[in-house]
Amino acid sequence: MNFKLRTLLAFSLVLFLGIVSSSPIVPHYLRAIDVSKAVTPKQVENDLGKVLSKGTLIFGPSNPAFADATERWSTHSMPADIQVVIEVAQESDVAKVVKYCHQNNINFLAYTRGHGSTNTVSKFKGIEINLSKLTGIAIQPDKKSALFQGGVYADLIINKLWSQGYIVPTGSNGCVGLFGPALGGGLGRYQGQYGLISDNFVSLNVVLANGTSTTVNAISNSDLFWAMKGAGHNFGIVTSAYIKIYPRKAKTWHYHNYVWSQDKLEKVFEALNRFQGKGQIPALMGVNFGQFSIEPRISETEAVIIWSFAYDGPAAAAEKLLAPFNAIFAISSTKGDVSYSELLVAQQTDINSSSCSSQPYVGSTTWLQTYNVTSQRAIYDLFNKQIAQNPGLAPGARVFFEGYSTKATQTIDPNSSSYPHRDEYLLVFFAVVTPPSLESVGRAWADKTLAIWHASQPGRRPATYVNYAVGNEPLESIYGYNGQLTKLRALKSKYDPLNKFRWYNPIVAY
């Protein structure tokens, strides 16, 4: 190589390094290389069988239990190659498995209930650490908190605590785990009263990427505690946690479900905007769920508008708030007073509901401040147009609207957690069950719906709830525009420098 060429290359390298040092390119030490070894159940049994607790199961795809142990709500987020499932029997087993994977360069993924829409999980190849046996719940002597193990889920928790006169914030669907939603913030019917699930964390028992078990709370590893409350999927596996619990206030919840025809759309959304304002849903009105969907008994070509309100208290107080909606003529109107576990059935979010079924969902999602009525009409018209063109998609197509009370969420210091969306009020998403032949149609429909929502809020940047993200959203929209990603990535270099936790909407690209 002649002197001129060497000089040119050296100058180019200096220039390149200068550009890189000022760019947002992720440092090399956070870029994991996918060299995970292929493993077999027999190999893992030989290596780990004697050190794991009695009752731990190790099996692979040929085992009849494999399908249930790896099932996901959205089949589009099914990992590419789960080679081995380790269904741990004790919390201590999690650290042993992670340490084994760390030492042998094997990818690992924690699993509880398999929810979430993101396609980033589909890239995973390696060992699944299944937490489904870790279902212990222990109310503490002071009756102010309880210890929840990592495999608990909403239906189990609600039934256990309600019968003893207590509640804890959980997600809204009975089939969903506690910690999957919580590590992304954790929305639910009680957040108007008590904040997000993660706002109620007292202390977490966490296994880090190298297999180390550690305590994470406001005193011990406080920086990691901040990260776990909003971006926790990127940092560790929660094997158990102490979480605040509360005495239940009322013996029953009041629900009121409406079905409206399309000609009432403008009236309904105008009434919702007056009722909700921007973050003004009353604390006891835990949630209002809405959807556009085809109901064949009413019409096979025009979607109806379905809305369900849930109030933590007596019917009289709830119906006073719902007077504007009672004034809009409905195709049907049903209401009642039920226990909290029965409320999930009334709102069709119970563990046996269709909303919990595993399907090939395609979708999109965003946050809104309020409903742009013109845009909602455009989304409704698009829905009917797509169904007319592809009637086979009708049974599995929905436009969803979720309005949780955010009263308590807004009172909590935003700097206390990495959760970035305390000033967002309405969560919306589109989902359609798509066979392979219509997947491109479903994705185009999802993109068009999202584009209308985004255009309905001129001047606002897109915002995405991490637990509803589909995997193609800008990271800033998920984790925040105000420096959160910079801080989170610095914490990654401290707690997970090899980026082992990179499967669920990762803050550092795979």
Curated annotation (Swiss-Prot):
Q: Which cofactors is this protein said to need? A: FAD
- GO molecular function annotations of the record: FAD binding; oxidoreductase activity
Provide this UniProt record's keywords sorted from A to Z.
FAD, Flavoprotein, Glycoprotein, Oxidoreductase, Signal
Sites carrying sugar chains: 130, 210, 352, 372, 415
* Classification via PROSITE patterns: FAD_PCMH
Q: According to the UniProt entry, where is the signal peptide?
A: 1-22
What does this gene product do? FAD-linked oxidoreductase; part of the gene cluster that mediates the biosynthesis of virensols and trichoxide, fungal natural products that contain or are derived from a salicylaldehyde core. The pathway begins with the synthesis of the reduced chain in virensol C by the highly reducing polyketide synthase virA via condensation of one acetate and 8 malonate units. VirA has interesting programming rules since the first 2 ketides are fully reduced, the 3 following ketides undergo beta-dehydration, and the last 3 ketides are only reduced to beta-hydroxys to yield the trihydroxy portion.
Name by which UniProt lists this protein: FAD-linked oxidoreductase virI
Record organism: Hypocrea virens (strain Gv29-8 / FGSC 10586) (Gliocladium virens)
Gene, per the UniProt record: virI
